[in-house]
Each structure stands twice: as structure tokens, then as C-alpha cells.
A protein has these predicted regions:
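Hydrophobic anchor at the beta1->P-loop junction of P-loop NTPases
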Residues: 6
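P-loop (Walker A) phosphate-binding loop of NTP-binding proteins
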Residues: 9
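ATP-binding Walker
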Residues: 12
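Walker A/P-loop
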Residues: 15
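NTP-dependent small-molecule kinase module
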Residues: 20, 24, 134-170
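Post-Walker A helix-loop "phosphate-sensing" segment adjacent to the P-loop in P-loop NTPases
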Residues: 23-32, 42
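ATP-dependent small-molecule kinase phosphotransfer cores
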Residues: 34-80, 84-89
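A glycine- and Lys/Arg-enriched "phosphate-lid" helix/loop adjacent to the NTP-binding pocket
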Residues: 93-135
């Protein structure tokens, strides 16, 4: 299936970039965090408070497993990579793109981790959360886009060029 699945840390621009990219290539757009909130009837922050990190990861994995569109850009939550089954599903239904950004830039973009509804797995800083996840992002990525110092439009153009040059998207 010709979907594009965006993974990366909170604040890496998955949702913002996803909407712009979907418009540019004529695809639909899904934000999996919004699907999770809709299913649970509460914010991500509240879901984490209620179920803890492990419970949230299970909810996220279940919701992500249920996503099965065609010609869609899917922005995942930053913790989606903790759900092995869902990540394998995403690899089956599309191309997984890791939006890579160093912790220093992420910290500037993020603000409060708690208010953002970020699964921390006991980690307290952006650097610690990044270190906990970076190998999983690399493991599941078909394409890695380094966003360091780039504007949104630059990243969209770079990803667009990669996508239109892939045989499966022609």
C-alpha cells in the first residue's frame, strides 16, 4: 500500500509536515494521536495519567494496528515505536520515514513534556527520552530525513523529491 508513515520524537514536526506533505502529493492525512484521543475520549496527557506509560503504549499500539488506509500520510505519536506489532503493520502498509532532529532542537520546540502528553518511561529529560528511542526510530525507518537547521518547506521538498522518485509512488 502506498502510505507514508512519519515517526520521530515529539516536536519533530510529524503532524505539521504530514498535513503539508499530504496536500502536496494529493494524499489523505491521519494523525494517530488524534485517533487515540477520540477513542479514549480524553487528552494524551490524561490517558497517560490514567493508565501509565505501559497502558498508554498498549492503547497506542491497538489504535495504530487498526489504521489501514491507502494513499495516506500518517503522523504517529513519538512513542509509536514502542509498539512492535503496530510498527510491523506500518512497514507492511507503507514507507516509514524517520524525522530526525537532535535533542537540543527538540527541547526548544517542545516546552513541557508533561503537558505535551509524552510517554517518558521513567526518563525526565528530552535527552534521556531521545536516547531511549533513537535506536527504535532507526530500526523501523525506511527513510531518514535529518531536519537539523531546515525549515518545514525544506523538509517537505526533500521528502517529496524522495517520494516522487520512488517507483512505488509513480
Amino acid at each position: 500500500m502506498n502510505n507514508i508513515i512519519l515517526i520521530g520524537m515529539p516536536g519533530s514536526g510529524k503532524s505539521t509536515l504530514g498535513v503539508v506533505l499530504a496536500k502536496k502529493i494529493g494524499y489523505k492525512f491521519i494523525d494517530s494521536d488524534l485517533l487515540i484521543q477520540e477513542r479514549e475520549g480524553m487528552t494524551l496527557e490524561r490517558i497517560i495519567e490514567k493508565y501509565g506509560d505501559k497502558g498508554f503504549i498498549q492503547v497506542e499500539n491497538d489504535v495504530n494496528l487498526s489504521i489501514n488506509p491507502e494513499h495516506t500520510v500518517i503522523a504517529t505519536g513519538g512513542s509509536a515505536v514502542y509498539g512492535r506489532e503496530a510498527m510491523e503493520h506500518f512497514k507492511d502498509i507503507g514507507t516509514v520515514v524517520y524525522l530526525e532532529l537532535p535533542p537540543e532542537e527538540l527541547e526548544v520546540r517542545l516546552g513541557s513534556l508533561r503537558e505535551r502528553g509524552v510517554v517518558s518511561n521513567g526518563k525526565t529529560t528530552v535527552e534521556e527520552i531521545y536516547a531511549d528511542r533513537v535506536e527504535l526510530y532507526k530500526k523501523y525507518a525506511d527513510i531518514t530525513i535529518n531536519e537539523e537547521g531546515n525549515q518545514l518547506r525544506d523538509t517537505v521538498e526533500k521528502l517529496y523529491d524522495i517520494i516522487i522518485n520512488k517507483d512505488s509512488y509513480n
